[in-house]
A protein has these predicted regions:
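Conserved glycine-rich cofactor-binding loop
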Residues: 18-19
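Substrate-binding pocket helix/loop in short-chain dehydrogenase/reductase
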Residues: 100-101, 105-110
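Residue(s) in the substrate-gating loop at a strand-loop-helix junction
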Residues: 143
């Protein structure tokens, strides 16, 4: 598949662009000729990333805090004045969790939901008029944790489950307007997501999970992701053997629970 045909000259707003899957998306999309709006909270990392991308002058850095929805209209106005259109909104920004449900503070629960769910959907609502105009596509980077719960990820899993319900509904509603939605469910991918995850007390987890260290290389993950986007798939599972758990849960739920309780939380 020639991905240049799908992304060349297209305007892509990407959240969570400064690291992990978002950073690799920036690299690969720029190689296909896309024009990128690079967003995350870390402006310094975004500026450093932009300098490494192909066609540097075509991209802009736009710092964005998903917990500050009041800033979205102004950011949206800036993007549309700059580019005149938005073809893809890739919702990759978010925060993970490494703490038990019983010990995680209310602040942690609310912060995860605010960033992963409320900020995500409110940005989509802000950008939706432009996507209707361009007959564009929303890409939501969820997780296999959006398909089943797992140790130390209660609020994270809840936020991802919520995204699936919201965007499955939105996809049905917006199909007649020409807007498509692709849900991406990565499994164990070699990114620093666990390092930046929130512990039960709200501090950073601060270490790399073994599951992440031994996970699928992020370049392969993103390559598969972009192929799914180009095909306008409604949903794609990306990872190694762990993604088989989704099918196992659906077909043999009792066996699924016996297997999953034996897995390492990290």
């Amino acid at each position: 598949m020639e991905l240049e045909n799908n992304f060349e000259g297209k305007v892509v707003w990407l959240t969570g662009a400064s690291s992990g899957i978002g950073k690799e998306l920036s690299i690969q999309l720029s190689s296909y000729g896309a024009k990128l709006i690079l967003s995350s909270r870390n402006e310094q990392l975004l500026n450093e990333l932009k300098l490494t991308l192909q066609n540097t002058a075509e991209h802009i850095v736009l710092p964005l805090d998903l917990s500050d929805a009041s800033s979205f209209p102004e950011k949206f106005k800036y993007v549309t004045e700059k580019y005149g259109q938005i073809d893809f909104l890739i919702q990759n920004g978010g925060i993970s969790q490494r703490g038990t449900a019983s010990e995680s503070s209310e602040e942690v629960v609310r912060k995860i939901m605010e960033v992963n769910f409320f900020g995500n959907v409110l940005l989509t609502k802000t950008v939706l008029p432009a996507l209707r105009k361009s007959k564009g596509q929303i890409v939501v980077v969820s997780s296999i944790a959006g398909k089943f719960g797992f140790f130390l990820r209660s609020s994270y899993s809840a936020s991802k489950h919520a995204l699936h319900g919201y965007y499955e509904s939105l996809a049905l509603e917006e199909e007649s307007n020409g807007v498509s939605v692709t849900m991406v469910c990565p499994g164990k991918i070699n990114t620093p997501i666990s390092t930046n995850a929130l512990a039960a007390d709200g501090n950073k987890h601060g270490s790399m999970d073994h599951n992440q260290e031994t996970g699928m290389p992020v370049s392969i993950c993103v390559s598969q992701l972009l192929k799914a986007v180009a095909k306008q798939k409604r949903e794609v599972l990306i990872g190694n053997k762990e993604i088989k758990a989704v099918t196992l849960k659906r077909l043999l739920p009792r066996l699924f629970w016996r297997v999953i309780r034996k897995q390492s939380p990290t």
